[in-house]
Amino acid sequence: MVMAHFVENFWGEKNNGFDVLYHNMKHGQISTKELADFVRERATIEEAYSRSMTKLAKSASNYSQLGTFAPMWDVFKTSTEKLANCHLDLVRKLQELIKEVQKYGEEQVKSHKKTKEEVAGTLEAVQAIQNITQALQKSKENYTAKCVEQERLKKEGATQREIEKAAVKSKKATDTYKLYVEKYALTKADFEQKMTETAQKFQDIEETHLIHIKEIIGSLSNAVKEIHLQIGQVHEEFINNMANTTIESLIQKFAESKGTGKERPGLIEFEECDPASAVEGIKPRKRKTFALPGIIKKEKDAESVECPDADSLNIPDVDEEGFSIKPEANQNDTKENHFYSSSDSDSEDEEPKRYRIEIKPAHPNNLHHTMASLDELKVSIGNITLSPAVSRHSPVQMNRNSSNEELTKSKPSSLPTEKGTNDLLAWDPLFGSSLESSSAPLTSSSSARPTTPLSLGTLVPPPRPASRPKLASGKLSGINEIPRPFSPPVTSNTSPPPTAPLARAESSSSISSSASLSAANTPTVGVSRGPSPVSLGNQDTLPVAIALTESVNAYFKGADPTKCIVKITGDVTISFPSGIIKVFTSNPSPAVLCFRVKNISRLEQILPNSQLVFSDPSQCDSNTKDFWMNMQAVTIYLKKLSEQNPAASYYNVDVLKYQVSSNGIQSTPLNLATYWKCSASTTDLRVDYKYNPEAMVAPSVLSNIQVVVPVDGGVTNMQSLPPAIWNAEQMKAFWKLSGISEKSDSGGSGSLRAKFDLSEGPSKPTTLAVQFLSEGNTLSGVDIELVGTGYRLSLVKKRFATGRYLADC
């Protein structure tokens, strides 16, 4: 049994205990409602997490089913689906708990209404004792005054009549005082009895309320505990499945499902060539005049076998790296010798083909003799694909690969004359100066893949992994390396919008002067870490920019710093280049964009965009908080923005809002105080300002400062220091200051003074407004960094500016 704390502690001289207890009972309804809101928000978070896990499980089904690792995706999918179901079960339990809390809240309201009627008598007793106490105090004071007056008249020797008159008044005051004392005693007894009963009733209500609330909280904690036990079981099951999936079983499963057979090739014995039968089987041969290379009708008799001698094989010589060595024989002679052939001959009966992949050194007679030899070497290397080196090819091997080789042969063998969109070699820092100075444009075929920048000693580019998809050259056509200030896109019918400020250049190499690199369907290529074209083949990261914008709102009342009201809010915006939309839409599961907000100790509240951003409410670090984005929702949102404004080069997405804790006038970067002196003919105004570096984490310059003061009374003339502008139509005075900082005169302190001559005075003091901004800094000191891989932060733009910054006298 709880002690009667309410009965013992809510009396007091002014008898306000009843009012305190009654309002405390009403606050119980607020607590119940807030608890329901808390559980509802938790359910929303769990539901969003469950949906994200479900999407992740579905995306696992779309991953590559090739290779020995493919069966592992089934384990991931099953585990992720179970985790999603666990969180979904928690959502259901929380929703049931919300209904229980709401039901209790309704019962609580009814109970409080009933209690209000029951304690109405106590309220009357409280009012009665408060009234009787005041009346008793007044009667006591009147009684004391009359007695003192009577004694004074006796001592001063007043007339008998005056003394008798004073005695009558004193007796009357005495009777009134005694009457109120008796009434107070009766009222006090009634008040104490009712107040004791009511205080105990209020305590019983609070005990019942707290017991019910604790039961609800216990249900909440048990539900969360059960779900976490299930999650632990899912993780244990995942660990066991991974342990049971051995490397041998994966390899065995791949061999059984993708195996091509267990029969090995048989032995083939050497057979002597019979010249007589070979001559009889030879048919006249004539080559088709318009036959295409590599496309030859096979009509050879199965019994006809040609056994060429060693000389007729004409196997090409190769060097140590697998490249064929060009013979000195003229190719025109070869064509003349084999112009006539059988129309139904097989490719084996044709001339032995010589396929060469050559790196030609610089030669005066070359097609591009004006180019530097180093340029030719680099471009040649950047556009060839090497097969494994072999020493010799048999005729059968040559013919087996004839279709691919003929296609290769059919391509132009001359050096490229134009730089391709994927030629990253051209922007290698080792070769930057020579390539920029070259006057001859370079190109590569459309099939050239992205290559890794090479050193001078590396001649063979490393092969690209086959499992990594290649992006088409137009995937990121909207990503351009043009550093610009962070600002919203501006649409116009006559000019394209400005390009997003995705990065600053990190290299001295310049690519903006090359007109051939800025075609409409060709992404710009560069060595800067800005928004250069991204290829999944070379594991590049996607550029994003972030803006931190804070707004300081303040109201100054006269020169009293205690009356200053301050509110500071902030916004976090992420800017995506327009070309990134194609990357997101072409990839069913783009990398999740995660970011961390640092230095949040001064923030009172953080509100993420619930439709696009998730966070972990269980994070215990008081100075940082991690967030991650719903990439499917972000993709849909960016596509919608793109449809609304397809010409925009980047799109801004609001992800966070926050409020900064303020400490009155100490949190304002510019302190203000106004003084007005109004008369019938003139008005004198003085505005004192003071730069406050303590409001900022790192003191910065306040720029574009404007002060606007409305003045009525029919201003006919204005004298001001520093000079101001008077707008007669708006009846306002305008001051413009270039900038204020610690390095300004008087440490950033000063005054604005003005005298106004009036024709219809006097003026009424009005509220003035101030505007300013500061670039590269925030008041809160909040910072942001990206977490994980897949993205890079090309730019962080920080600024704070005034919202409603007002001053009154």
UniProtKB/Swiss-Prot annotation:
The modification Phosphothreonine is found at residue 385. Belongs to the FCHO family. One of its GO terms (molecular function) is identical protein binding. Residues 541-808 form the MHD domain. Residues 3-250 form the F-BAR domain. It is a peripheral membrane protein. The keyword Calcium does not apply. It is found in: Membrane, Clathrin-coated pit. Homodimer; disulfide-linked. May form homotetramer. Interacts with AP2A1. Interacts with EPS15, EPS15R, ITSN1 and ITSN2; recruit those scaffolding proteins which in turn may interact with the adaptor protein complex AP-2 at the plasma membrane. Interacts with DAB2 (via DPF motifs); mediates LDL receptor/LDLR endocytosis. Residues 87-156 form a coiled coil. There is a cross-link at residue 297 (Glycyl lysine isopeptide (Lys-Gly) (interchain with G-Cter in SUMO2)). Transmembrane segments: none annotated. It comes from the Eukaryota. Changing residue 165 to E: Loss of function mutant which is unable to promote clathrin coated-pits formation. Cytosolic mutant which is unable to bind and induce membrane tubulation. Residues 435-456, 501-520 have a biased composition (Low complexity). The keyword Translocase does not apply. GO terms for cellular component: clathrin-coated pit; clathrin-coated vesicle; plasma membrane; presynapse. It comes from Mus musculus. Residues 390-416 have a biased composition (Polar residues). This is F-BAR domain only protein 2. The gene is Fcho2. Functions in an early step of clathrin-mediated endocytosis. Has both a membrane binding/bending activity and the ability to recruit proteins essential to the formation of functional clathrin-coated pits. Has a lipid-binding activity with a preference for membranes enriched in phosphatidylserine and phosphoinositides (Pi(4,5) biphosphate) like the plasma membrane. Its membrane-bending activity might be important for the subsequent action of clathrin and adaptors in the formation of clathrin-coated vesicles. Pfam families: GMIP-like_FCH (PF22699), muHD (PF10291). GO terms for biological process: clathrin coat assembly; clathrin-dependent endocytosis; membrane invagination; protein localization to plasma membrane; synaptic vesicle endocytosis. InterPro entries: AH/BAR_dom_sf (IPR027267), F_BAR (IPR031160), FCH_dom (IPR001060), FCHo2_F-BAR (IPR030122), GMIP/FCHO2-like_FCH (IPR054713), MHD (IPR028565), Muniscin_C (IPR018808).
